[in-house]
């Protein structure tokens, strides 16, 4: 007798295998109303083309996973992605003078929305990572209700977060 096999069940069981291996950078940290996690993984192909550094010219895809906390005063539910933030990074390798800097782009992957960019590092070693998070700004951004009935609190001014990690390389793309 044949055992019935469920294709949806098989796909559900294989889904975790489709994720790239992420390397956490320290513990998530807090900005006012936000939790910010830092991770890296192998460089990522993106659409539209040209949005980020090419994978062939990059060592890692650096991400800031930014979610609302329970005490978020800007109207976001706990755990939800917060869009339209201005997120930048700087990386400094211990014992090296150059500082790598860049701006993150909002993007979405199979594990959800985040801010990120492909980055060329200065080789293996210990790195100091700084995220600078600024609130939405300008007309092309996220409007905020300010009336007494439906308004939300003003945005935070600026938030800087500091992480340290050791980069020893990553596995070959597709080898995860």
Task: Label the model's feature ranges.
Residues 62-79:
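Short amphipathic, basic-aromatic surface patches that mediate peripheral association
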Residues 56-58, 76-87:
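Short coil-to-beta strand junction motifs in C2/discoidin
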Residues 15-17:
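N-terminal signal peptide c-region/cleavage motif recognized by signal peptidases
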Residues 103-137:
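Short, solvent-exposed, Trp/other aromatic-anchored flexible loops in extracytoplasmic proteins
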Residues 2-10:
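Sec-dependent signal peptide recognition
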Residues 95-103:
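Surface-exposed loop/edge segments in extracytoplasmic proteins
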């Amino acid at each position: 007798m044949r055992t019935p096999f469920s294709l949806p069940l098989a796909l559900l069981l294989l889904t975790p295998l489709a994720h790239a291996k992420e390397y956490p950078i320290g513990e998530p940290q807090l900005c006012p109303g936000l939790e910010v996690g830092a991770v890296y993984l192998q460089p990522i192909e993106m659409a539209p083309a040209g949005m980020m550094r090419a994978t062939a010219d990059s060592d890692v895809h650096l991400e800031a996973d930014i979610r609302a906390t329970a005490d978020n005063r800007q109207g976001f539910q706990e755990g939800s992605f917060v869009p339209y933030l201005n997120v930048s990074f700087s990386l400094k390798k211990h014992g090296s003078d150059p500082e790598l800097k860049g701006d993150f782009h909002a993007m979405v992957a199979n594990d959800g929305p985040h801010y990120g960019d492909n980055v060329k590092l200065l080789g293996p070693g210990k790195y100091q990572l700084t995220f600078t998070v600024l609130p939405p700004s300008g007309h092309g951004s996220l409007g905020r209700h300010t009336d007494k009935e439906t308004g939300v609190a003003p945005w935070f001014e600026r938030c800087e977060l500091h992480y340290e990690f050791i980069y020893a390389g990553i596995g070959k793309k597709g080898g995860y």
